[in-house]
């Protein structure tokens, strides 16, 4: 869950940032007694890295956000599916999200991309002994 507080005049620049990061707005309303507007949204953890920097740059530093873990949700697709082809700098289709998330996580941790055949080979070798 992300809660964003911003002056009313910069709120329209928040929505495209959320959309680019697969955000889903659950509540947006003015904050009573203040000149601020509150936007609450769900955003995948994988897309939350650097979100605050983007919000601040798109609103000229006038918005701030709080990120709080809210819930787990199953990501569609199979992360080991070799039929899924991911293209650089393009959003992944819904059934390729699990593979996209896995590859991004492995790259961020300095690991190479996983190969399904490697796991099948290791599993077969272990089972045969």
Where are these regions (language model features)?
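Accessory interaction regions appended to the cores of large information-processing enzymes
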Residues: 1-119, 129
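Intrinsically disordered, low-complexity Ser/Thr- and Pro-rich stretches
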Residues: 121-123
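Cysteine-centered motifs
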Residues: 125-127
């Amino acid at each position: 869950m992300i809660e964003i507080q911003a002056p009313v005049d910069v709120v329209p620049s928040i929505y495209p940032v959320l959309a680019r990061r697969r955000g889903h707005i659950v509540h947006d309303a003015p904050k009573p007694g203040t000149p601020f507007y509150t936007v609450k949204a769900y955003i995948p953890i994988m897309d939350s890295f650097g979100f605050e920097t983007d919000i601040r740059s798109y609103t000229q530093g006038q918005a701030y956000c709080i990120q709080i873990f809210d819930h787990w949700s199953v990501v569609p697709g199979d992360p080991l599916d070799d039929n899924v082809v991911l293209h650089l700098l393009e959003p992944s289709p819904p059934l390729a999200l699990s593979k996209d998330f896995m590859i991004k996580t492995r790259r961020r941790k300095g690991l190479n991309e996983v190969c399904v055949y490697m796991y099948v080979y290791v599993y077969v070798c272990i089972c045969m002994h």
